Structure formats: C-alpha cells, structure tokens
Amino acid sequence: MLVGLARAGATEPSRQPGGETLTIDGKGITLTFPEDGPTLRIGGKLQLDYGAASLRQAGLPEPFPENIAVRRSWIESYLSYGKVLEVAFQYDFAEPRRPINDAAVAYTGFANTLITLGNMKEPFSLDQLISDNATLFTERSLADAFAPARNFGLALGHHGTDWTVAASVFGGNANTGLTREGVAATARVTTAPIRTDEAVLHLGLAGSLRDLPRDAAPLSLSSRSEAFLFRQTFVDTGDIRDATTIARLGLEAAYRTGPFLVQAEYIRTRVERSGAGPLSFQGGYIQASLVLNGQGRAYKLAPDYGATYAVFAGIVVPEAARVTRGGLGVFELATRFSALDLDDGSLRGGIERDVTVGLNWYPDRNIRFVADYVRSHASPSALAGGRTVDADTFIGRFQLYW
C-alpha cells in the first residue's frame, strides 16, 4: 500500500460520518476528530539488511550466520489530544527479546516544556537520539556501546530558541524488568550558537550515573562492529560481575552548512567495582556526509515527547526529484571513523577501529537504500583470544517507513 502511495502521492482526506477526517499519506494513517478532539496516527517501518563479510585471519568463525535478515519491523501509534497530551507506542516484530520500544505519555501543557513518563530513550548521545530512520549508516558507531538507549523513567525537557536541557530518572527496560538494572540519573544540555536555514553549529554535553543492584545480571559492554548481521562481537568486556555503578560522560559537536554535515562525539565510561579498582573505557567517532543533489539535513530542536532534543532529521526528497515523478531521487555520500577501547588493566575486552564509507539513495519519499563498506581492525580482539582481527564488510539496507 505504501509503495503505491509513494507512486501516487497522498490520498485526499475523507470525511467520516461522525465528522472525523481520515488521511493516508507518507506519515501513515491519520484519524483526526473534530472540535479539538484527539488525533490518532498509525505508522511503521521495515528495514531489511543484506551483506557479506570476510575475516583476514584464519581459524575464526563464519562472520555472518545468514546474509539477509529483517533488522526492524515496527508498527507505531501516536495519539495527540489538544496541546496537552502526547501518547506513543512502538512495537518491533523483528525483536523477540525487546519488542517494546517507546511506550510513553507526555504532558505538553507548559510552554516549551515536556514531561514524559514511560519507556523511552535516555537523553544521552546525539548518535543514539537520532531516529533509526535517519541514521547516516545502517548502524550507529562503535561508541554506541556506551549509550544507555531505552529504559523506563521520567524525563523533563525544556528548550529556548537555540538551546535545550533534559533531566531524567530511569529504571530498567520495560521488556526485561523495571527494577533489574538499578536506577540512573541522566541529563543532557545542548546549544546551537549558529542556527540558520543555511548553517547549524551544535554543541552538547551529557552525563549519566546508574547505580546497579547487587542481584542484577552482570554488566557487559560490547559492539557488533557496525553491522547487524555479525554473529559475534570483536570487542567485549565479558561479564563484570562486581560492578556497582556505571558513569558516562559524553561530548557532542556537529556543524552543517548547506548539504554538508560533520558530526563527532567522545564518550568516556567508568565502572566502579566492589572489592576491586574502577575500570575506565572510552570511544568516539567523527563522520561527515554530503547530499549531492538536495538539501541538507534539518536540525530539530524539540521532540513531540520524550528527551530526543537537538537532533538532525532525515533527507527530504523534493517533488521534482522523486523517481515516480521522473526524477533520479536524492543521493548522499558519507564516511566515518570510529573507535572503541574496552581495555583497562587486566580486563582485555579489546580495542577496535572502523572506517566506513557509504552511499544513501532516496528514490522517493519514505524509501531509502543504503550501501556501506566497513573496514574493521580489532587488536587485541576478545573474539580471537587477544589476537588481531581484520574484517571487510559490505552491508546494504532497504528501508520503508511511514
């Protein structure tokens, strides 16, 4: 149905017997009730990954158990009531262990302020807070291993004309138990000293401190080398059974001018242990992209709910560029260097560095094809018992979202 919509465009809003208006377009299915009543929108996404990888060292396991897999298969629903209430629920049919993503309710009655309760992303890391629909590559950087991502909690956010602040308290994830992972306090502040239609300069600082319960599952940190299809991780701390707290500090910077965008982050993580000294890990990335025949990514200061403030949105395909209108679509080139250091003292989780180059093609609205090449170097690698691992990976994605 949605591919057909991409070809034909949005349907005309239809008036229902009770006065409701039903619209089907690139944003999904929207039902609007009259007289300042609620608005219900149903959308979703499908991400299909395919690829191949080779390891340069002999004697290591096959990198991909299969060469094609569904990365995400979401259905999403959003309910707005006047200017005071936002409700969101997202369910991923491709993730049996953690199918619930956002499940939150937000009060929006105060000016420029959001109060949100539910399962949502903690306000940490620009890369993590950008929507899965709009990430530059198929996967986020190696440093995303440190991002707390989604948990259940309470977040308070506020923004001005060029700045944002979000503070929050979180427990565990709604899928695995709200009390199993302790309690975290997470906050993020951003400023955009340059913010015009042509250029944006973004600066951000985030911090998170999580107290871990003694009966919690052991803490571990790892990364799948920027490709979902990998069977095993190249770097992995394994179980840190005596961890008592985990603290994270993140620095962000990004600059967009016209179709060019450069973005970087550095994250440092410290794990306190009972009966042993603390462990320190670090990671970061720098990435750049250039839209070859279209507009650059827009800067979105405030979300509809939650704490995903000050992020870059996806690519907009102009009407004349749509393949269904005789155009060629929009093309975007991208490159990234990322690094992750999980070595400290006697804990040898490994050090990995990746270089990625990619091409994104947006043939029409709500459709994207991604082609990435990733060159990975891990030395030492937890996968190879402390030896070096080098990998060459091609990963592609077909993405449909509405």
Kindly give the residue locations of the regions a language model identified.
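Generic N-terminal initiation segments characterized by hydrophobic and/or small/turn-forming residues
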Residues: M1-L2, G19-T21, G28
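Long, low-complexity, intrinsically disordered polar/charged segments
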Residues: A10, T191-P193, D197-I240
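Outer-membrane beta-barrel pore domains
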Residues: P13-L22, P61, P218-W402
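Cleavable N-terminal export/targeting peptides
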Residues: M1-R15
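Outer membrane beta-barrel
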Residues: K27-P213, F281-R325, E332-A334, S338-G345
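Hydrophobic alpha-helical elements and their junctions with loops/disorder across both membrane
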Residues: L5-A6, G51, V271
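Generic detector of low-complexity/intrinsically disordered segments
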Residues: V3-R7, I24, W402
